[in-house]
Amino acid sequence: MTTLHSTPRADGFHMPAEWAPQTQTWMIWPERPDNWRLGGKPAQAAHVAVAKAIARFEPVTVAVSAGQYENARARLDVPNIRVVEMSSDDAWVRDTGPTFVINRSGEVRGVNWDFNAWGGFDGGLYSPWNRDSQIGGKILEIERAPRYCTEGFVLEGGSIHVDGEGTLITTEECLLNSNRNPHLDRAQIEAVLSANLAVDKIIWLPDGLFNDETDGHVDNFCCYVRPGEVLLAWTDDPQDPNYARCHAAMNVLQSSTDAQGRSFTVHKMPIPGPLYATEAECAGVDPVDGTQERNPTVRLAGSYVNFLIVNGGIIAPSFDDPLDSQAKAILQDLFPQHEVVMVPGRELLLGGGNIHCLTQQQPAPHKN
């Protein structure tokens, strides 16, 4: 594997928007019994549904442990899904995988961020995380893609969204959290993002969704629809703890312009629920010291914003909620050239995330 010691911006590379053409989507097979109930079996079924939905539109590669390889290979039984053996600590490839960058000469490289399980020993979700910290490099090696390393800089892919035209959206709750990069201030963090993603302007939303155990990842709260347009999780209920968060984000977006000088058009996506795990669902998770516990009294951070854009498709979660049909209609209206496919997302939510968190798109080479 080639490790580069420059930066993507210096070499003419940038992170493309999610709607740019893709060669494939990466996923990791869930099996961790102290995070996924019943040994991960319900989550694996949900994972299969997501992978097969994506495979209708583009190839999928699923990384799986040696112990689960035979099971995963048998269940992911469609030609467009590749299964590769790879050790991991959990399934969140959005956060553990590389961020792919491209240039205008048809090359694809990757940024290999540091990973500390969403906070390390200061609020992190599990320990150890050494196998997860190797995921980015392993994926890039399989793809023979040169990598840029950001040793000493912790970042999860779910904490950023870009428009491919110089603007990045994130949250202060996550990127300025003392359990990520306490040695860096806002300006220094912006400099790292600028150098590695070739962005020129960063929009800082104050917080993400209430009770998001990643410390407020933006991909569960606000995402780009196209340059200059975003989709924001929303509630009109003043009693909902998300109310202040949504309105604070709206204020920032309405008072900001992007790197191209455009004002933002903000579309609203209703928040489902409130959703909670049942006592039985929580009882199915193995209790282990140092791992995030599952509690039926704690509201789940369910969100329709946690969807994935693929070639010609939108893969979005449903929650058996009355708002499911409205969410699908909103997405179809915003993406008229894509087919919106809703996949049951409750089992994924019970593990702490959803479809966008569990996937990582690999952009296709761009050639002028």
From Swiss-Prot:
Pfam families hit by this protein: PAD_porph
Catalytic activity: agmatine + H2O = N-carbamoylputrescine + NH4(+)
EC number: 3.5.3.12
Catalytic residue positions: 357
EC category name: hydrolase
Keywords noted in UniProt: Hydrolase, Polyamine biosynthesis
Signal sequence range: none
InterPro entries: Agmatine_deiminase (IPR017754), Peptidyl-Arg-deiminase_porph (IPR007466)
Listed GO MF terms: agmatine deiminase activity; protein-arginine deiminase activity
Pathway as given in its UniProt record: Amine and polyamine biosynthesis; putrescine biosynthesis via agmatine pathway; N-carbamoylputrescine from agmatine: step 1/1
GO annotation (BP), single: putrescine biosynthetic process from arginine
Segments crossing the lipid bilayer: none
Its biological purpose: Mediates the hydrolysis of agmatine into N-carbamoylputrescine in the arginine decarboxylase (ADC) pathway of putrescine biosynthesis, a basic polyamine.
Entry similarity comment: Belongs to the agmatine deiminase family.
Subunit structure: Homodimer.
Name of the protein described by the UniProt record: Agmatine deiminase
Species of origin: Pseudomonas fluorescens (strain SBW25)
Gene: aguA
